[in-house]
Amino acid sequence: MNAPVWWQQLLLAMTGGALGSGLRFAIGASLIQRFGTGFPWGTLTVNLLGSFVAGVLLVWLDARGPSSWPLRALLIVGVIGGLTTFSSLMMECLVFARTDRSTMIGIYLAVTLLAGLALVVAGARTGQWLVAR
């Protein structure tokens, strides 16, 4: 199978991005309804979920070879890119600083980065396990 041309990959990434953004909105709204707005549970959840799924997909798609480029565009660039959000993470740190909760910034960043790294590694290992089956 030939690699898709750039515009095909662009359309796949845009479609996946719309799906990922919709998922982010739904997850965030659900967690705000359940836990309130005192802590950004939605952003933390989507970033950690996205880290794990990105690890799985990266290894799984890599094992499929060049024919996986359309799926990479759709799932990793699109869905995971739309689901996860660095800008919201930074904005929420600013909100913590502006509402006299600066101590939460370090905790939030540490949990996000350390758990995100652990989850992307766990996802990659899960992907290796899936490929080996």
UniProtKB/Swiss-Prot annotation:
Coarse class of the protein's main subcellular location: membrane
Positions of Na(+) binding: G81, T84
Keywords: Cell inner membrane, Cell membrane, Ion channel, Ion transport, Membrane, Metal-binding, Sodium, Transmembrane, Transmembrane helix, Transport
Catalysed reaction equations from the record: fluoride(in) = fluoride(out)
GO cellular component: plasma membrane
Any single GO BP term: cellular detoxification of fluoride
Location of the protein in the cell: Cell inner membrane
Activity regulation (UniProt): Na(+) is not transported, but it plays an essential structural role and its presence is essential for fluoride channel function.
GO MF term list: fluoride channel activity; metal ion binding
Membrane topology: Multi-pass membrane protein
Entries under InterPro entries matching the protein: FluC
Spans through the membrane: 12-32, 41-61, 76-96, 104-124
Family named by the database record: Belongs to the fluoride channel Fluc/FEX (TC 1.A.43) family.
HAMAP family recorded: FluC
Annotated function: Fluoride-specific ion channel. Important for reducing fluoride concentration in the cell, thus reducing its toxicity.
Protein's recorded name: Fluoride-specific ion channel FluC
Native source organism of the sequence: Xanthomonas euvesicatoria pv. vesicatoria (strain 85-10)
Name of encoding gene: fluC
